[in-house]
Regions:
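Proline-aspartate-enriched helix->loop->beta-strand connector
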Residues: 129, 133-139, 157, 266, ...
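Extracytoplasmic ligand-binding site segments that recognize negatively charged/polar headgroups
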Residues: 88-96, 144-147, 161-176, 211-236, ...
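Basic- and aromatic-lined ligand-binding clefts that recognize polyanionic substrates
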Residues: 62-65, 70-74, 187-247
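Extracytoplasmic substrate-binding proteins
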Residues: 53, 147-220, 319-343
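Bacterial lipoprotein signal-peptidase II cleavage site
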Residues: 5-8, 20-41
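A short, structured surface patch at a secondary-structure boundary
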Residues: 71-126
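N-terminal export and membrane-targeting signals
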Residues: 1-15
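Structured C-terminal subdomain patch of bacterial secreted/periplasmic proteins
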Residues: 179, 269-343
Length: 343
């Protein structure tokens, strides 16, 4: 199923491209206001988050994004950021995610500045943000520290995550982004379409109902088990799947999005099947054949849905407003799960 993108289907939103095109050159003197072409409403808007609240006084003209998913969320409601976070693990330094690049090209929008992020948000190149001159920074799914938030706030208002880093549900990332842009109704329309897609997939796969799973990443010596709070896991529950009780029993007190299991503890991970995320096919195959991972009952039984290579993993970790129907991503994962459960 191909989702209908607002940037393709709604001519009025395509005009938003002109509003934010000045980004790539780093100039600001001839930028058209986003509010001239995208009907953002309800300003000033107050967004509450983990570090307090942020007031967006008026429709932003130069949006920057940080972290994951907010770039796509903005584009899905017709706003093309002037600066976006680098996704170096997925596509290398200075490049755009393929579905993001496709969106800019389809709309005829000059590509944004790609802000260096080769350390997964551990450090922030503030000078690059200053040069991009944003009037709003959107980062609802990120790892911002309070110190980073405070420093970025000296550059522009910052919308941070609502509770804990890297745990904001995929749909909240979309709704928070749309709300901050004064486009809440447009965000709701995007969510309605995606939820409809998920409902259709669930209806097409009644065998998913009630089946338990765990999502893992093999760290070679230990296995990372994603918590139910992690969006790549919670999204799968919308298909009728259930997070295995053995995952919750691992428990963590740090509010993180994964648990760590040593190879000696892998027998604790009991589920109907495993979703294994890997950076390459070789790593994925090794996960199936290691003597240590055979302690996981589902692995020993061959009940493993594989997701590998950086682009594919990123497209579902978690899916974004633009990557839901990326051919090798969510549709392929659903097919893989169906295949595992049919065996």
């Amino acid at each position: 199923m191909r989702l209908r993108r607002p940037l393709i289907a709604v001519a009025g939103l395509a005009a938003a491209a002109l509003a934010l095109t000045a980004c790539a050159s780093g100039t600001t003197d001839e930028t058209t206001s986003a509010s001239d072409s995208v009907a953002g409403t309800g300003f000033p808007i107050t967004i509450e988050h983990a570090f307090g609240e942020t007031v967006v006084e008026s429709a932003p003209e130069r949006v920057a994004t940080w972290g994951w998913g907010s770039t796509e969320a903005a584009i899905s409601v017709g706003v093309y950021p002037v600066a976006v976070a680098e996704q170096s693990w997925t596509v290398g330094e200075g490049n755009l995610l393929p579905w993001v690049e496709e969106a800019y090209d389809a709309a005829g929008v000059e590509h944004p500045v790609v802000i260096n992020d080769d350390e997964g948000g551990a450090t922030i190149p503030y000078e690059e943000f200053i040069e991009a001159a944003p009037d709003l920074i959107i980062a609802p799914y990120s790892g911002l520290t309070e110190e980073q938030y405070d420093t970025l706030s000296d550059i522009a208002p910052v919308v941070a995550y609502p509770e804990a880093p890297w745990t904001t549900p995929w749909d909240e990332t979309i709704s928070i982004t749309a709300t901050a842009l004064g486009l809440e109704a447009e965000g709701d329309a995007v969510l309605d379409e995606i939820h409809g897609y998920l409902a259709d997939e669930a209806a097409a796969h009644p065998e998913f109902e009630g089946k338990t799973f765990a999502g893992v990443w093999d760290g070679d010596g230990l296995v990372y088990v994603y918590t139910e709070a992690d969006p790549r896991i919670s999204i799968l529950t919308e298909l009728g799947l259930e997070v295995a009780p053995s995952v919750a029993e691992l428990d963590t007190t740090d509010g993180g999005f994964f648990y760590e299991l040593s190879y000696e503890q892998l027998d604790k991970l009991d589920a109907d099947f495993i979703v294994n995320y890997s950076s390459s096919q070789e790593e994925a195959e090794a996960f199936l054949t290691k003597p240590e991972t055979q302690a996981i009952p589902a692995v020993a039984a061959g009940k493993v849905a594989q997701v590998y290579d950086p682009v594919t993993v990123s497209s579902v970790s978690p899916p974004t407003a633009l990557s839901f129907d990326w051919a090798g991503g969510m549709p392929a994962l659903v097919t893989a799960i169906a295949g595992v459960l049919a065996e």
